[in-house]
Amino acid sequence: MNPSSPVAEAAASNAGPWSARWLGVVAIFVVVMTPLLAYLAPLGFAPLLALAGVLVLPSLKLTRAAAPPLLILVALVVWAAISMSWSPVVLGPLRPKNYGDIETLTALKLALQLATYGAAVVALRELPEAAAERAAAILAYALVGLAVLTALDAMMGAAIYLKFHTVTGEAMRPDVALVKVSLATYALALLFWPASLVLSRRHGPLLIILLLAGTIVTSKITSSDACLAALAAGGFAWLMVRYLGQLGAKVLVGLIAIPFVTAPLVVLVGVQTGVVAWMHRMLPASWDARLDIWTFAADHIQTHPFRGWGLDASRTFGVAIPLHTHNGELQLWLELGAVGAALAGVFFCWVAYGVVRLAQRSRSEAAMAAGALVSYLVIGAISFGVWQEWWIALGALTFIACGMARAGGENTENWGELTPLS
């Protein structure tokens, strides 16, 4: 769509001339920083999104469409804070004096993240179409470059990353550097979907193939199995929504709900039927360790199935659970019980239902959202802790990217609706 179209002008008018330009500046800043942080410092996604949220506060306008998912997340954060009253975790100082003290207050961090990340997601939905299209294009091309760089670096044993690291003056083993390179694949796996939609409208399949190949090669060499699984599952979701439309999207809602409801039961049934024991014999060491963690978590969920053990309780079980359960649904059940798992499940089902509504207008955009959503959930189900700041921030960034990727598409009559939450 032409940037001077009535739709684009309406979006700019709603935000105000100064506000619209400022949002465009913030969007460019975020997309330029994204590939740099993905490669050099993935933990930096947390401060990036927090800063973006603060920067857009003057332009923030809460809408009715954003209210339901935000209220669900507020309820989840409140329940998490309440659960601290019975959590076995020893709290830090009630009056934190430095960042180390804040690190121990997960409930406070969650509230701050919801405020800042949420502000970034909601405010950047008001980007004028021309600014969103520009930012989306920059991000897409930058991700292609990142995929090529990481693939080359992985094949060279992280030699490029080690060159950058010498600036810090600290030594790093090549195997550790390769692990650092692998972290970029998580951003690539999530942002592949909006980037591929943008590239498909501009250059056809060539750059998309390059982006996908670079991500797969890096994931394979660095043993980033979670990203390979995410791309496969996301690809299935993409195909289902792209070719079945609303029917496929409705099936997706059910598929997303199932793990939040049945995760502990599935593990316990697997133990009772001997499936878990069989998997222990078949899977490599890293997955064998996950099975042990999941079995332990499912067993302990039975002690407090409704209220859970309390926020951050996963950290208190010693070697049985190193830091977290490596499964988002089980961690929610273990720490926040059925209440927390239900709230999180409702939120993600709300997002998935947004894909159903989006499929009415554009199957390609709905398929993009489905692929990104499923990829995030798959990685969260086998790799990271639910409360890790950078991982939550990367999820928020994926929302923003999916919204921007819709600019210039065939269905932009509802330009304010940039994300599947609309």
Please annotate each region the language model reported:
Residues 1-25, 203, 360, 397-422:
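A juxtamembrane structural motif centered on a specific transmembrane helix
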Residues 2-62, 76-92, 376-380:
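N-terminal signal-anchor transmembrane segment
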Residues 28, 115-119, 133-165, 176-243, ...:
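Alpha-helical transmembrane segments of multi-pass inner-membrane proteins
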Residues 28, 49-55, 236, 369-379, ...:
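Transmembrane alpha-helices of multi-pass inner-membrane enzymes
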Residues 75, 93-125, 137-138, 143:
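Aromatic-anchored transmembrane helix interface
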Residues 152, 239-285, 295-302:
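A membrane-periplasm/extracellular boundary helix in multi-pass inner-membrane enzymes
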Residues 279-336, 355:
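Long extracytoplasmic/lumenal interhelical loops at the membrane interface
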Residues 338-377:
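Hydrophobic transmembrane alpha-helices and their immediate junctions
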